[in-house]
Amino acid sequence: MAITYQIDLHAGMLFVVADGETTQSERLEAMRTWLTDPMFRPGLHTLCDLTAAVTVPTLPELEEIAGVIRRHAAVIGRKKLAIVTSRPVTFGVARQFGALAPGALLTVQVFKDRHAARAWLTEPSA
């Protein structure tokens, strides 16, 4: 249905929300949109809220997303990515993505609670 985002430069974060059914082309278009947003900068920690998402990416789609991240490494920079889910299947797919994501760029954690995810994002990196 919709993927929306907001960039909070004061907090140094990108907030992404997926709501309802989303397709791979919608996911990729959303990524292209925030990567070219004038407010986007490398290293923005990201909170991706999938609690209202109905569909999940397939393994090939996750691999495609990881490839986009690798190709845009200079624009994305090193960052933390917190993924918030409410359904077990979404939690599992998010963990799969964490294993596929380029570790040199992303530190990925999956949460069931938005507040815990935000707290992790604001902790100093080791």
Model-derived features with residue positions:
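Amphipathic, Lys/Arg-enriched alpha-helical "gate/interface" segment within cytosolic domains
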Residues: 1-126
